[in-house]
């Protein structure tokens, strides 16, 4: 794969599961990776990564016998050996607390799956308006506090930084341009509080529309299209390896 991708790892338990907290799910995933590919686990823990090269989210419904983990990968080369070992072994078991779950399938199609080669992002035409759906609580760090608001600069400056960390072709753009030329024109959001196993985190969920001002340069429109598509894989805001900031692109014009 020559670009970011997202799959859903499906696991089965022998007895009904209680709804796990995000920290437990994240720990279970890292434990599975450590058993499958120790080198990858060490890389994912490396402090040299300002942004983690993956996101992880537990998809509903929660409880029951099945657990579905949505994994998006921003650095395909890092995970190449992991998938080779997965195929040879038929998957790796997941230990969630004291419960072992068996791998059932790797789902590569569906609403939260997909892939886009890096060059294709650059082929997207510039847009002036975009709508995004935030499926899980999303929050941004500003100073010493979390800010659960879909402010244009916080969202797109964060996506720009993630893009430049993941892609071999950086996007040269001043993040301040998002403050100057991009406006939040419509929003149907609500605040949710989630206990992640360590702290209560507040974030917004819902649908938000952004629109460029008439005098916005063309390169801002191209960045808006590129980063909106990239958000599906990169997630938005903080704690994206713990299920927060799950984003879907809805439409643009």
Question: How would you name each of these model-derived features?
Answer:
Residues 1-253:
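RNA-interacting cores
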């Amino acid at each position: 794969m020559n670009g970011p991708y997202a799959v859903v790892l499906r696991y089965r338990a022998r007895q009904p599961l209680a709804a796990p907290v995000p920290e437990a799910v994240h720990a279970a995933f890292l434990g599975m990776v450590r058993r499958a590919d120790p080198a990858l686990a060490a890389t994912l823990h490396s402090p040299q990564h300002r942004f983690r090269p993956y996101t992880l989210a537990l998809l509903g419904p929660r409880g029951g016998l099945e657990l579905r983990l949505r994994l998006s990968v921003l650095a395909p080369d890092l995970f190449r050996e992991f998938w080779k070992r997965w195929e040879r072994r038929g998957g790796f078991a997941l230990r969630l607390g004291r419960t072992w779950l068996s791998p059932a399938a790797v789902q590569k199609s569906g609403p939260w799956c997909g892939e886009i080669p890096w060059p294709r992002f650059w082929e997207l035409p510039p847009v002036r308006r975009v709508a995004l759906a935030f499926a899980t609580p999303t929050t941004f760090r500003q100073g010493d506090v979390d800010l659960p608001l879909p402010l244009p600069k916080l969202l797109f400056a964060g996506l720009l930084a993630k893009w430049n960390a993941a892609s071999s072709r950086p996007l040269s753009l001043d993040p301040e341009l998002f403050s100057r030329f991009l406006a939040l024109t419509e929003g149907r959001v609500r605040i949710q509080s989630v206990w992640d196993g360590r702290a209560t985190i507040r974030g917004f969920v819902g649908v938000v529309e952004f629109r460029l001002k008439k005098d916005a340069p063309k390169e801002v429109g191209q960045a808006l299209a590129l980063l909106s598509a990239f958000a599906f894989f990169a997630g938005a805001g903080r704690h994206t390896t713990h299920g927060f900031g799950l984003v879907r692109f809805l439409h643009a014009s």
